[in-house]
């Protein structure tokens, strides 16, 4: 594993929390469909794996949100990338805080 990515997708849906959640849920399902280790949080979803695959997933998230019916989407991405591998895993970063 040479990368981890935290992604927050914000569909441009006004005053409709149910619709916003539905679209975000579709994006999360898309992310999970790749079978990578994924942690869903209240503000962002974190995934780890190969950098190139993660970038493809990030690019696809916007398309999934648009296809799900939102007219526009803002996406915030945090990336940790170490070409030689051995980035800290999600579990190494947070497991001590979730006991």
Q: What are the functions of these language-model segments?
A:
Residues 1-99:
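Charge-rich, low-complexity N-terminal segments
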